[in-house]
Amino acid sequence: MKRLLLVALMVLVSLVGMAMVNPVIAQQSAPTSEKAKQIEALVNKAAALIESKGKAAFPELRKKDSRWFSGDTYLFVYDLKSNVLLNAAFPAREGTNNTGQKDANGKLFHHDFIQMAKSSKGSGWVDYMFPKPGQTQPSQKWAYVRGFNLGGVPSLVASGFYPE
């Protein structure tokens, strides 16, 4: 009986430990600001647009000073193998692969984006450290990620903001 209780306790401790380490299982509190709501709506509308038009929607999503790309708010699209299909703010990254890239704290945030898109909910918030435009020092950034299909290919679309 003691042995069974010990095994059950070890399993419980392991699950709690995994939840603390895995940001997809146990995220910090998702942002609830007005900006967060705007980002979430933007990503959901972009997913619908891309699902309907496919890659033909990309030129529209790249337009600066539009509803899709304004200031430091822009969209990015990856397939679930971490290949960059669209990055409105950093077009040179398109066609590259983000596998293994870490933020300033060593977090594999691209991996976390993919895990969020694959999660049972299919969408949610991921936080990471990333420099603000024109800066080199990383700041906390939140990205809302949503999984969707791009011409039958499982993909994700996301956008983020700096909370400070």
Model-inferred region functions:
Residues 2-6, 11-164:
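N-terminal membrane-sensor/transducer module of prokaryotic signaling receptors
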